[in-house]
Amino acid sequence: MLELDFEQQLGDLYLQVNTQLPTEGITAVFGLSGAGKTSLINVIAGLIRPRKGRIVLNDHVLVDIEKGICLSPEQRRIGYVFQDARLFPHYRVKGNLQYGMSPEMKPEFDSIVSLLGIEHLLSRFPLTLSGGEKQRVAIGRALLTAPDLLLMDEPLASLDLPRKRELLPYLEKLSGEVNIPILYVSHNLDEILRLAENVLVVDNGKVRATGKLEEVWSSSALRLWLQKETLSSILNVSMVEHHNRYEMTAVALADQALWLPKMDVQPGTDLRIRIDASDVSLVLEPPRGSSIRNILAVKVVEFFDDNGHVDVKLVLSGHYLWARITPWARDELNLRSGQWLYAQIKSVSFHRQL
C-alpha cells in the first residue's frame, strides 16, 4: 500500500493529498493540465519536499516531516520515467541501461531487454533512436534499478502518433509481466483506458476520486472533469462465444449478453470495453425488428441536465452505464430515479484484454 498524506504550496497551486493507493498494477494519475499530477509524483519521488505530512510505501516510511524524516530520491527505491527520456548521450544504449543497475537485477538484464524489444538497439547511441525507442530504453533503465515503485510522467506526451502506437503495446506487456506497481500520469483518456486498473483523479491540487477504473469512471464526480464529448462508460466483461454465422462475439455483462464485432480471443477471456454515452438510447419497451443488437434492461440511478442535453446514469447488476439524451426524450419517457427501462447500445469500443 502507498499511503499519501501531505501538503505543499507550489506557486499558485496548493497541493493537498490524502489517499491510499494499491501497490500492484498500473494506477493512472488523471487530471487536466496544471491540476498537480506531476507535482504529486515529484513529491513521492523526493524531488519536492512537502511542507508537512507522511508518505509510506509498503510500511517503509519515506517521509514523516513531524519526525524529521525525508529520504533522498536515491534512498527511496523509486524509478522515474520522464516525458523526455533523459538518456546519457555519450553512452550507448547498453551503457544507459547499466547505469544505476542494481546488482540483483543483473540476471534479469536480458529478460528486461527482451520484454521491451530493444535487443537490436544495445550498441547504438541515443542520438540515433526514435522517440519511442528512447522511451523504451528509459523504461528499461528505470526497471533495472530494482524499484519498489515506478513513476511515469506522461511518457507518450512528446511522441507523435506512430511512435505512441509503437510504445503502447510495450506498456501493456509491462503491466502484465512486471510485478512492480506503476503510477502513470496522463491526461489522455485512451491511454488510461488501455493501460490502467486503478485511477486517481486530481484537480487543482486535490484528490477528487480514487479507486478501480470502472468504478471511478462511472462516478458522478468524474463526469464534471471530463470534456462533454468524452462522457462514456467502462465495463469489465468476459468473452462467452463467437457467433456461428456472423462476425460477432458475445460477452457477458452480469447476467446479460452484449454483442461486439468479432475479436480474436478465447471464451473466458476478460476484456475491457468502452461505450460512449452518445451511443446509448433509451426506450420504455424492447422494440421488435430493430437493427440494434444490444438491448439491455437497466434501472435509472440519477440524471443531470447540462447545456441542452441530459446525462442519465443507469445500473445493470452492479455495472454502471451512461446515456446521453435530449430534454425532449427525458420528458417523453417521464424519466425518474428507480425507473426500469431498456438501453439500446449502437456501438461498442474494445479497449483492452485484461
From Swiss-Prot:
A molecular function GO annotation: ABC-type molybdate transporter activity
EC identifiers of the protein: 7.3.2.5
UniProt keyword annotations, A-Z: ATP-binding, Cell inner membrane, Cell membrane, Membrane, Molybdenum, Nucleotide-binding, Translocase, Transport
Domain of life: Bacteria
Membrane-topology annotation of the record: Peripheral membrane protein
One Pfam entry name: ABC_tran
Protein residues bound to ATP: G31, L32, S33, G34, A35, G36, K37, T38
One Gene Ontology CC term in the entry: plasma membrane
Compartments in which it is found: Cell inner membrane
Name the UniProt record assigns to this protein: Molybdenum import ATP-binding protein ModC
Naturally occurring in which organism (per UniProt): Photorhabdus laumondii subsp. laumondii (strain DSM 15139 / CIP 105565 / TT01)
